[in-house]
């Protein structure tokens, strides 16, 4: 819904019929239904939270945020600038909006209790008599075969050594 309104800008499309439910958020005059006639009357305006203004003499009070806005704003009072561009609200809404919750003052965080006492405070549990498991006898390992080349002989001609370094047995 908000995407469609953002695309269309401040005016409603012609196929949407005007009703008092289509109205503006706390903002300056607004044009409905491509009529090019700005609605100045606050009767058709609502606040950001979606509630209508009620007229009390010359003051207009927003039902939701209880802000009072005068038709002729005095220079002493700072003007309420809307954060975003005017947004059209469809009514009746599909889901009823819950009223905004009042902000609760934050209490200091409660330190979390440790789940178990520290090891120094904890008494050691009496353990049952612990016996080491019976040692399994390992099968005797086979002795490794000696290396094929004797360290005394050095590399032979067949093993990549030079023929001059090979021992001479002939």
Swiss-Prot record:
It holds the Pfam family FYVE_2. Expressed predominantly in oligodendrocytes, in CNS myelin of the cerebrum and spinal cord. No expression seen in sciatic nerve. Keywords: Cytoplasm, Phosphoprotein, Repeat. Residues 69-170 are annotated as: Disordered. Residues 93-114 have a biased composition (Pro residues). It is found in: Cytoplasm, Perinuclear region. Residues 93-119 are annotated as: 3 X 9 AA approximate tandem repeats. GO terms for cellular component: mitochondrion; perinuclear region of cytoplasm. Sequence repeats lie at residues 93-101, 105-110, 111-119. The modification Phosphoserine is found at residues 85, 98, 107. This is Myelin-associated oligodendrocyte basic protein. It comes from Rattus norvegicus. The gene is Mobp.
């Amino acid at each position: 819904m908000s995407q469609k309104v953002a695309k269309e800008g401040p005016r409603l499309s012609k196929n949407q019929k005007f009703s008092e439910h289509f109205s503006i958020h706390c903002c300056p005059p607004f044009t409905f239904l491509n009529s090019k006639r700005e609605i100045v009357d606050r009767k058709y305006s609502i606040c950001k939270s979606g509630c209508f203004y009620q007229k009390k003499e010359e003051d207009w009070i927003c039902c939701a945020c209880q802000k009072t806005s005068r038709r002729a704003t005095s220079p002493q009072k700072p003007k309420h600038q809307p954060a975003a561009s005017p947004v059209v609200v469809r009514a009746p809404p599909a889901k009823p909006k819950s009223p905004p919750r009042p902000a609760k003052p934050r209490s200091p965080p409660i330190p979390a209790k440790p789940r178990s006492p520290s090891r120094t405070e904890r008494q050691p549990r009496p353990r049952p008599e612990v016996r080491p498991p019976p040692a399994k006898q390992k099968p005797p390992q086979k002795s490794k075969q000696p290396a094929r080349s004797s360290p005394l002989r050095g590399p032979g001609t067949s093993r990549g050594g030079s023929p001059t370094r090979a021992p001479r047995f002939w």
